[in-house]
C-alpha cells in the first residue's frame, strides 16, 4: 500500500516488545519488583491489592494517584517513587537480558521493512533507560532515527499518553508536519494521543472493551505488528 507518511512512530511495550514475561501471570516480573519496593518499608500486598491501590490510580490519575497511595501507607511520595522506578527498571532490564522479555513475533522483520520506507521513532511510556536498553539489546538501534521514553521523576508521569508530548517532540526534531506522521500502538490510550497530536494511527489488536474508554478511532486496525506491511 502506498502512503505519503514520512515517519512511523512506534509504541514499545505490547507493540514490538512482549513485556508480559515468562511468569504464570502477565508482567509478573513487574509485580515482584513492586513487592521488593514495598518490602523496604515493611509493607506486603497481594497482586489484587497492588492493582487496586496502586496500578489503577497510577493509570487514571498519574502522580496524584501515586501520592494518594503513599498517603494511605504513610510514605514519602518522591522517595517511594524513586525506589519503585529503580526496582522496576532493574527488573525489566534483567528480564530482557535473561530472555523473559522478548520481541513480539515478526517485530524485527517489519521494523527493518518499515525503516527502508520511513523514518522510524519510538514514543513509549516506559522509562527512557528501558527504551535505550531494549533497542541496544535487540539490535534495533540502526533502524530508528529517534526514540523517547519518559523520565523517571514523578512529575514526568504527566507526559504519558494520551498527552502527545513525545509525539510532538519527534515531529519537532524531524521538522515534519502532522500529516507526515502515523503512530502505531497496541492501546487505545495511544490512539487518543495520536488524535490529540493531530496525526493518523494504527491500533494493534481489537480490544473493544478498552477502546470504549477512549474517544478516538484509529485510522487503521491490524491484528499484530506483522500486518503493518498491509497498511503502510
Language model features with spans:
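Active-site neighborhood of HAD-like aspartate-dependent phosphohydrolases
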Residues: 1-51
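Asp-based, Mg2+/Mn2+-dependent phosphohydrolase catalytic module
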Residues: 1-5, 128, 132-232
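Alpha-helical elements of Rossmann-like donor-binding domains used by nucleotide-donor carbohydrate transfer enzymes
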Residues: 29-36, 68, 109, 113, ...
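Short, acidic loop-to-helix structural element flanking the phosphoryl-transfer center
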Residues: 90-122, 128-132, 164
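Generic enzyme active-site microenvironment
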Residues: 9-11, 123, 183-184
Amino acid at each position: 500500500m502506498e502512503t505519503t507518511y514520512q515517519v512511523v512512530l512506534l509504541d514499545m511495550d505490547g507493540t514490538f516488545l512482549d513485556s508480559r514475561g515468562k511468569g504464570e501471570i502477565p508482567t509478573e516480573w513487574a509485580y515482584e519488583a513492586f513487592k521488593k519496593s514495598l518490602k523496604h518499608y515493611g509493607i506486603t500486598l497481594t497482586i489484587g491489592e497492588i492493582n487496586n491501590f496502586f496500578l489503577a490510580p497510577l493509570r487514571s490519575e498519574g502522580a496524584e494517584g501515586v501520592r494518594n497511595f503513599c498517603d494511605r501507607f504513610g510514605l514519602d511520595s518522591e522517595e517511594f517513587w524513586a525506589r519503585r522506578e529503580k526496582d522496576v527498571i532493574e527488573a525489566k532490564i534483567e528480564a530482557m537480558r535473561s530472555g523473559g522479555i522478548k520481541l513480539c513475533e515478526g517485530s524485527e522483520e517489519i521494523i527493518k521493512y518499515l525503516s527502508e520506507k520511513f523514518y522510524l521513532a519510538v514514543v513509549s511510556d516506559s522509562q527512557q533507560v528501558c527504551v535505550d536498553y531494549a533497542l541496544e539489546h535487540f539490535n534495533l538501534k540502526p533502524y530508528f532515527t529517534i526514540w523517547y521514553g519518559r523520565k523517571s521523576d514523578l512529575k514526568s508521569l504527566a507526559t504519558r499518553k494520551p498527552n502527545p508530548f513525545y509525539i510532538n517532540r519527534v515531529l519537532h526534531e524531524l521538522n515534519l508536519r502532522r500529516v507526515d506522521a502515523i503512530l502505531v500502538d497496541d492501546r487505545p490510550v495511544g490512539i487518543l494521543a495520536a488524535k490529540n497530536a493531530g496525526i493518523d494511527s494504527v491500533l494493534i489488536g481489537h480490544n473493544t472493551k478498552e477502546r470504549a474508554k477512549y474517544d478516538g478511532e484509529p485510522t487503521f486496525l491490524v491484528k499484530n505488528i506483522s500486518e503493518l506491511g498491509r497498511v503502510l
